[in-house]
């Protein structure tokens, strides 16, 4: 009888957990839809400004002074902008992006530091004992463009002052609801567009290309950081929704298994009671 009570208590406990994970799944689904819309809406602009900047950087600057964000110099120190969630419960997303950044940082033979977005990233960088230049947490589920400007400002200031010679950005790219891809790519200096031999650029710039480039470069860095954060948020909410759905399904499966065990134990208990009654009646006869 004690075993039946324990099993019944376990079924009730798992059922309560299933209710919680189901509620979390629904919340994540709602946030995911909004995050996906924002991330996908900004993707065409981000891709186009990247293309224009890379094309401009490939043009000869006619003796103009090179913009500091384009300056290539011997790499003596590297920085990584590491973008992660503030919270967990999103499957393997946090572990995957942390592994990507951690492997890269630990492989470097020169000093490397991190500018970290998200509490999970902050904890990870501290755990692997790497230098952290700055940390930004609690940006929320819907950060605005202005909210991310201090992040890009830290990166640009360090690069232009010569403290950092190369900047990489690590974030989780949203592919589909079920697929999120950890990405690590160079942000600074801007990589010029490599054109096939004989191919000409089709852009006509007014004013001249150098003026446009100098004006757009800071915006490009700011937009790249902002878009990477939006992609990471969309990936986080998608991964969390899938993780909570899997948790709910697993809870339902466990409830089914426990119910079967409970029914067998109850049937065995009833059979034993009947045998005791029959045995007692036979003894009295």
From Swiss-Prot:
Topology in the lipid bilayer: Peripheral membrane protein
Entry annotated with the keyword Mitochondrion: no
Transmembrane regions listed in the UniProt entry: none
Biological process annotations from GO: proton motive force-driven plasma membrane ATP synthesis
Pfam families registered for this protein in UniProt: ATP-synt
Domain of life: Bacteria
Keywords, alphabetical: ATP synthesis, Cell membrane, CF(1), Hydrogen ion transport, Ion transport, Membrane, Transport
GO cellular component: plasma membrane; proton-transporting ATP synthase complex
InterPro entries registered for this protein in UniProt: ATP_synth_F1_ATPase_gsu, ATP_synth_F1_gsu, ATP_synth_F1_gsu_CS
Annotated localization: Cell membrane
Gene3D superfamilies recorded: 3.40.1380.10, ATP synthase, gamma subunit, helix hairpin domain
Gene Ontology molecular function, alphabetical: ATP binding; proton-transporting ATP synthase activity, rotational mechanism
Assembly mode: F-type ATPases have 2 components, CF(1) - the catalytic core - and CF(0) - the membrane proton channel. CF(1) has five subunits: alpha(3), beta(3), gamma(1), delta(1), epsilon(1). CF(0) has three main subunits: a, b and c.
Entry's family note: Belongs to the ATPase gamma chain family.
Function of the molecule: Produces ATP from ADP in the presence of a proton gradient across the membrane. The gamma chain is believed to be important in regulating ATPase activity and the flow of protons through the CF(0) complex.
PANTHER family in alphabetical order: ATP SYNTHASE GAMMA CHAIN, ATP SYNTHASE SUBUNIT GAMMA, MITOCHONDRIAL
Entry protein name: ATP synthase gamma chain
Species assigned in the record: Dehalococcoides mccartyi (strain ATCC BAA-2266 / KCTC 15142 / 195)
């Amino acid at each position: 009888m004690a075993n039946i009570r324990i099993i019944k208590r376990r079924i009730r406990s798992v059922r309560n957990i299933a209710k919680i994970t189901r509620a979390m799944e629904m919340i994540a689904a709602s946030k995911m839809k909004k995050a996906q819309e924002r991330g996908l809406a900004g993707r065409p602009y981000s891709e186009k400004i990247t293309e224009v900047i890379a094309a401009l950087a490939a043009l000869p600057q006619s003796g103009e002074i090179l913009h500091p964000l384009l300056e290539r110099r011997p790499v003596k120190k590297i920085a990584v902008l590491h973008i992660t969630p503030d919270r967990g419960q999103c499957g393997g997303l946090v572990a995957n992006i942390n592994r990507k950044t951690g492997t890269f940082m630990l492989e470097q033979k020169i000093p490397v530091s991190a500018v970290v977005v998200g509490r999970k990233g902050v904890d990870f960088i501290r755990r692997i004992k790497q230098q952290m230049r700055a940390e930004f947490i609690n940006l929320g589920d819907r950060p605005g463009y202005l909210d991310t400007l201090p992040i890009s400002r830290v990166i640009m200031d360090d690069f232009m002052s010569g403290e950092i010679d190369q900047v990489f950005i690590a974030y989780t790219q949203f592919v589909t609801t079920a697929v999120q891809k950890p990405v690590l790519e160079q942000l600074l200096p801007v990589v010029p567009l490599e054109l096939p031999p004989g191919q000409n650029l089709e852009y006509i710039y007014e004013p001249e290309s150098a003026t446009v480039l100098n004006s757009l470069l800071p915006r490009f860095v700011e937009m790249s950081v902002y878009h990477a954060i939006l992609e990471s948020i969309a990936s986080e909410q998608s991964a969390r929704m899938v993780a909570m759905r899997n948790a709910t399904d697993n809870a339902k499966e466990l409830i089914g298994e426990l119910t079967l065990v409970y029914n067998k134990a109850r049937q065995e208990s009833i059979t034993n009671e009947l045998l005791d009654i029959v045995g007692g009646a036979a003894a009295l006869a």
